[in-house]
Amino acid sequence: AAATIILLRKLFNGESKTKKMSISNLYKIANKLGSDVPACLESKSLKISSYGNKIKRIKLSNNYYYLLVNPNIQLSTKQVFSHFSCFSHDIPKNKKIYLGDVSIYNSLLSSAISLAPQIHTILSVLKKLPNIIACGMSGSGSTCFGIFKDLKNILPVYNYFEDSNFIWYGRVKDYSVNRVRCSKMLENKF
């Protein structure tokens, strides 16, 4: 949805330097489409809390290697929240995992797993890997991630998931190069 909003903004604005749809209007539209859409407009590493309305940019270390694994199952944010049984601002102490100053706990994980058990399977495989620093699920799912200190620890699991899951691995700087940088596009190009 975020990519469509950006494309529509480009088409609407055309070559005009004066009649641009404002970024604030983009965010108003994004909020109406779904609680996760404004975060997708950012296209940055973010910590999102509450119902998607509290967004904070975070800096992920480039000293680590990241593995993204998606089981090719689409979960809508609305669907995951509808299966969300309890909302608590307190993270159980035994569930806290930190990477620097960033907590990796995701309160939507149980809900997403109830809809897509493959997420549990992926995380179980990741947790068993030697030298994994942390793993979890991104947002409302279904993409899972693993964080490693060394690239050589990713390659065996990459081969395991390669045939049946969409995957990516590398450092943060590599990911930034390979994905659409929506926020840069918003700031500079349109």
List PLM regions with ranges.
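Short, small-residue alpha-helix embedded
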Residues: 1-14, 138-148
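ATP-dependent small-molecule kinase catalytic core of the GHMP/sugar-kinase superfamily
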Residues: 10-134, 147-190
